[in-house]
Amino acid sequence: MAENKHIAALNNNKPALSEDQAVQLIESLYGVKVLNIKPLPSYDDQNFYIKSCSEDPNGCCEYVMKITNSEDSRYGELLEAQTSVMVFLCSNGVPAQKPVFTKNGQSLSLETIDYGSTIQKQAVRLLTYLPGTPLARVVATPEILFDIGKMAANIDKMLAENFLHPNKTCFERGQFIWNLSNTSLLRKYAHAVKETELQKIIEDVITQYETFVLPNLNCFRKCINHGDLNDHNILVEKTSSPGSIQEQYKVSGILDFSDMSFGYYIFELAITIMYMMIESNDPLHAGGYVLAGFQSVIPLTDEEKDALFFLVNCRFSQSLVMARYSVQLCPENEEYLMITAKTGWKHLQTLHDMGKEAVEKIWFETADSYVATH
């Protein structure tokens, strides 16, 4: 698999279908008559919201069309395995999207697409549309953060214990830049960060990973990670009654399984904490609520607890460094690429300055307090 998922978007491999091209593909591959189409954001692929003129046999009339970049489209077995995970999770009560099959009964179709200046082979999938509000648009309460931590743990646990697939080894993705095992690869891209102080923090994070985490990887419990539970990939719906003092939500959808890879339970927790900190008004305590939810399903071992602080810093560093690098090569996508950077550098600097002991104290005491009062 490509080492850096952004590189595909930066080497003219990112899909760029017009809406007319997308409509033609949908109608020819799936027999879906399109009533409305609109683009959806994507890092290195292309997504469209589709509304059809009539319901399918399952009562569905809303879809998401996903066109995968030409680099990742070379790995059809991985894309098919990701789709199988979605089907598996749906059957086990997780609100994930379901694939819509082509007229030929396939879950994806590799299409040769003519862009005029170039011809590319890109995988096309149609998935059911999940209604809901992205978590990024609501104020995350302790309750929803707990539920998200619990959901993250449940997903990994289900996949580790019960997911069977002939191409499961596809999730061993080697040098995949977004796997926390590959934190050291960030040095190749750190030159994109120009500020000396920030460069030093990134190098400190990588060195701490290599010193305190890497030697202990074999102590962690292995699983398949979703790997990208950010606040745009989690949908929620309101559960509170009109007039309630505080709005309450429940998780109504989990999106985007393209970063799945073999990792460890503690990786999923660190990734989820990092993303839940990004938009929070109380980022340090937010980590504690996620931790409480995760541990309600998968209690951490001492070795895993000891690595958590370092791994959260690693994920901040991955996201921030790769965003800077990607913007240099793809400036027209800056607004989307830099979502994390708006508050991410501040949060990473805070964690770095406070240090492991002080941050862990807040996380674990917050988790214990939440459990004791709920």
Swiss-Prot record:
It holds the Pfam family APH. It comes from the Eukaryota. It is an enzyme of class 2 (transferase). The active site is at D228. The keyword Transmembrane does not apply. One of its GO terms (cellular component) is cytoplasm. It is found in: Cytoplasm. Its EC number is 2.7.1.81. Gene3D superfamilies: 3.90.1200.10. One of its GO terms (molecular function) is hydroxylysine kinase activity. Its main location: cytoplasm. Keywords: Cytoplasm, Kinase, Transferase. It catalyses: (5R)-5-hydroxy-L-lysine + GTP = (5R)-5-phosphooxy-L-lysine + GDP + H(+). PANTHER family: AMINOGLYCOSIDE PHOSPHOTRANSFERASE DOMAIN-CONTAINING PROTEIN-RELATED (PTHR21064), HYDROXYLYSINE KINASE (PTHR21064:SF1). Belongs to the aminoglycoside phosphotransferase family. Catalyzes the GTP-dependent phosphorylation of 5-hydroxy-L-lysine. This is Hydroxylysine kinase.
